[in-house]
Amino acid sequence: IVQSILRLWTSFLKVFNPDPEKAAKKGAKEEGLLSDLSALDKKTVLQIVDSAFVFSCCWSLCVTVNTQFRRPFDLFFRKVCNGEIDGILKFNNRKILPEALNKGTIYDYVFFPDKNEWKPWLSLVDKDSIDKFAKDAVVQDIVVTTIDTIRYSYIQEHCINNEIPTLFVGPTGTGKSVYINNVLLNTLPKEKFNII
């Protein structure tokens, strides 16, 4: 779990560091999204680092609990992040949980490090393309847009693009294979990825 947290966290912190391999392929200096750190104040940098850490914990450590225990775990995780539990390391006397997460649970939001912004998962939905199926679509291959399909597709795509191994677990018949196939076949750029 620790390795998963660190892999995700590192992938989100790439906004501070341009990828030299991509730059070499392009033949020019690639700018990281936030590569000019001198333009950012220390508080903003800390907010991005903290938020990336919280999001990484949420989607590696916190997702190990099943749906019925997410709310209690959310409350516990908030107390840890806010330094409200004695005996647990405090984060230099500062709260690392952003104000944006005051409504709902930590599972309800996605973090965009390049904008230092938290948004509800549902804001990622393209309302024009919701549940438009091909006439010849096979029932078992249809992906109905839900908050879970949005979350899992985003996380899977992010992990694939950052070469982070993933494992989707859960009860039989909950759509794991369909989510994975949907991302592999319909979301990833065809010029970069081939399905074998």
Question: What are these model-derived regions, one by one?
Answer:
Residues 1-196:
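AAA+ P-loop NTPase catalytic core
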